[in-house]
């Protein structure tokens, strides 16, 4: 063997060894991080005790602001935050509903309430001024951005009515951002006055529709995906001020928006869903791969974690499944509407 051949063989051997070690390192790293993620998922969901809301000022005269508070998930947020000892500002469209809920909360939980009638479909500066006027003199520590709207039924983007498109973007995005702009400085001021002995909390409702690009719900899906990026960015900005920010991702919940009435293991009622949110506030649960995000209900968490760690949320496979499912839902909804119209005609 010539000297050149000998040197070449040694060089090739070293390169091969380096490649083998590199592959082994990546493999060990992947296995380790996956194992830690699984462990963190299980600990968040099933081991750690419920979060004590005293860290957010519960039973200390502090206030929570809840949007979309007259029905479903928003109403349940109001009740459960009050049960933990927070006074509550209720924001929704129908004043009569808000007043009834406020009376029930004050009677049952012995806390104070404020109500603000607010039509989220109208992007009106006077409405935001009304909110700011109410909360500016209150020691607010918690904001729940719950108000939202989806499509009446799954619909192709090119057939989406202009009003529905505008309402979805206005309610899910513009209103959420502008209410947060009004309330977050009040939360920061409250935390600062307490010398950070209490923390602030901003929860914004996300959706599997934003996690997974969803054909036939394209506008809604995009609006919720926007909230993912916005909420994570906001979390980075407000963390130094002692405010926790989280996007709350859910699959289906029984509500007027989902049009589902019967709960199941994978479709909780609002009470069980909100309990999971508040008990795990600040933890990632099923959203182990995402900063400042939580998927708190246990079956939703397992679904989210499974999708992220197998096919991926942006995969063609996931998109195709979503396409088929929502196309089928649309067909059934149109047939149901046709039968209803035929009955009226008869």
UniProtKB/Swiss-Prot annotation:
<dbReference type="GO" id="GO:0005789">
    <property type="term" value="C:endoplasmic reticulum membrane"/>
</dbReference>
<keyword id="KW-0275">Fatty acid biosynthesis</keyword>
<feature type="binding site">
    <location>
        <position position="65"/>
    </location>
    <ligand>
        <name>NADP(+)</name>
    </ligand>
</feature>
<feature type="active site" description="Proton donor">
    <location>
        <position position="220"/>
    </location>
</feature>
<comment type="pathway">
    <text>Lipid metabolism; fatty acid biosynthesis.</text>
</comment>
<keyword id="KW-0521">NADP</keyword>
<feature type="binding site">
    <location>
        <position position="220"/>
    </location>
    <ligand>
        <name>NADP(+)</name>
    </ligand>
</feature>
<keyword id="KW-0276">Fatty acid metabolism</keyword>
<feature type="binding site">
    <location>
        <position position="119"/>
    </location>
    <ligand>
        <name>NADP(+)</name>
    </ligand>
</feature>
<keyword id="KW-0472">Membrane</keyword>
<dbReference type="InterPro" id="IPR027533">
    <property type="entry name" value="3_ketoreductase_fungal"/>
</dbReference>
<dbReference type="GO" id="GO:0042761">
    <property type="term" value="P:very long-chain fatty acid biosynthetic process"/>
</dbReference>
<protein>
    <recommendedName>
        <fullName>Very-long-chain 3-oxoacyl-CoA reductase</fullName>
        <ecNumber>1.1.1.330</ecNumber>
    </recommendedName>
</protein>
<keyword id="KW-0256">Endoplasmic reticulum</keyword>
<feature type="binding site">
    <location>
        <position position="146"/>
    </location>
    <ligand>
        <name>NADP(+)</name>
    </ligand>
</feature>
<feature type="binding site">
    <location>
        <position position="224"/>
    </location>
    <ligand>
        <name>NADP(+)</name>
    </ligand>
</feature>
<dbReference type="InterPro" id="IPR002347">
    <property type="entry name" value="SDR_fam"/>
</dbReference>
<dbReference type="GO" id="GO:0030148">
    <property type="term" value="P:sphingolipid biosynthetic process"/>
</dbReference>
<dbReference type="GO" id="GO:0030497">
    <property type="term" value="P:fatty acid elongation"/>
</dbReference>
<feature type="binding site">
    <location>
        <position position="253"/>
    </location>
    <ligand>
        <name>NADP(+)</name>
    </ligand>
</feature>
<keyword id="KW-0443">Lipid metabolism</keyword>
<dbReference type="InterPro" id="IPR036291">
    <property type="entry name" value="NAD(P)-bd_dom_sf"/>
</dbReference>
<feature type="binding site">
    <location>
        <position position="255"/>
    </location>
    <ligand>
        <name>NADP(+)</name>
    </ligand>
</feature>
<dbReference type="GO" id="GO:0045703">
    <property type="term" value="F:ketoreductase activity"/>
</dbReference>
<comment type="function">
    <text>Component of the microsomal membrane bound fatty acid elongation system, which produces the 26-carbon very long-chain fatty acids (VLCFA) from palmitate. Catalyzes the reduction of the 3-ketoacyl-CoA intermediate that is formed in each cycle of fatty acid elongation. VLCFAs serve as precursors for ceramide and sphingolipids.</text>
</comment>
<feature type="active site" description="Lowers pKa of active site Tyr">
    <location>
        <position position="224"/>
    </location>
</feature>
<keyword id="KW-0812">Transmembrane</keyword>
<dbReference type="Pfam" id="PF00106">
    <property type="entry name" value="adh_short"/>
</dbReference>
<keyword id="KW-0444">Lipid biosynthesis</keyword>
<dbReference type="GO" id="GO:0141040">
    <property type="term" value="F:very-long-chain 3-oxoacyl-CoA reductase activity"/>
</dbReference>
<comment type="similarity">
    <text>Belongs to the short-chain dehydrogenases/reductases (SDR) family.</text>
</comment>
<feature type="transmembrane region" description="Helical">
    <location>
        <begin position="19"/>
        <end position="39"/>
    </location>
</feature>
<keyword id="KW-0560">Oxidoreductase</keyword>
<dbReference type="InterPro" id="IPR020904">
    <property type="entry name" value="Sc_DH/Rdtase_CS"/>
</dbReference>
<keyword id="KW-1133">Transmembrane helix</keyword>
């Amino acid at each position: 063997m010539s000297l050149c051949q000998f040197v070449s063989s040694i060089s090739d051997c070293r390169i091969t060894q380096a490649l083998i070690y590199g592959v082994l390192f990546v493999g060990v790293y992947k296995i380790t991080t996956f194992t830690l993620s699984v462990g963190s998922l299980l600990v968040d969901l099933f081991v750690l005790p419920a979060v004590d809301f005293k860290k957010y000022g519960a039973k200390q005269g502090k206030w929570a602001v809840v949007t979309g508070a007259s029905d479903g998930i928003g109403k349940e947020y109001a009740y459960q935050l009050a049960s933990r000892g927070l006074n509550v500002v209720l924001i929704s469209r129908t004043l009569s509903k808000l007043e009834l809920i406020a009376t029930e909360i004050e009677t049952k939980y012995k806390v104070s309430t404020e109500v603000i009638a607010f039509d989220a479909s109208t992007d009106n500066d006077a409405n935001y001024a009304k909110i700011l006027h109410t909360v500016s003199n209150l020691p607010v520590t918690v904001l729940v951005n719950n108000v939202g709207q989806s499509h009446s039924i799954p619909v192709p983007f090119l057939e989406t009515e202009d009003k529905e498109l505008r309402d979805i973007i206005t309610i899910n995005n513009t209103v959420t951002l502008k209410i947060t702009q009004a309330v977050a400085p009040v939360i920061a001021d409250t935390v600062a006055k307490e010398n950070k002995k209490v923390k602030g909390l901003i929860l914004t409702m996300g959706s599997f529709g934003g996690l997974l690009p969803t054909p036939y719900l394209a506008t809604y899906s995009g609006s919720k995906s926007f909230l993912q990026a916005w909420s994570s960015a906001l979390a980075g900005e407000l963390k130094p001020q002692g405010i926790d920010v989280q996007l709350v991702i859910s699959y289906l919940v029984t509500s007027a928006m989902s049009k589902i009435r019967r709960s199941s293991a994978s479709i909780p009622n609002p009470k069980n869903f909100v309990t999971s949110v508040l008990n795990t506030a600040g933890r990632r649960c099923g959203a182990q791969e995402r900063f400042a995000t939580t998927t708190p209900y246990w079956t939703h968490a397992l679904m989210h974690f499974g999708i992220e760690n197998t096919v991926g949320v942006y995969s063609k496979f996931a998109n195709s499944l979503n396409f088929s499912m929502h196309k089928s839902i649309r067909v059934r909804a149109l047939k149901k509407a046709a039968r209803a119209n035929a009955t009226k005609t008869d």
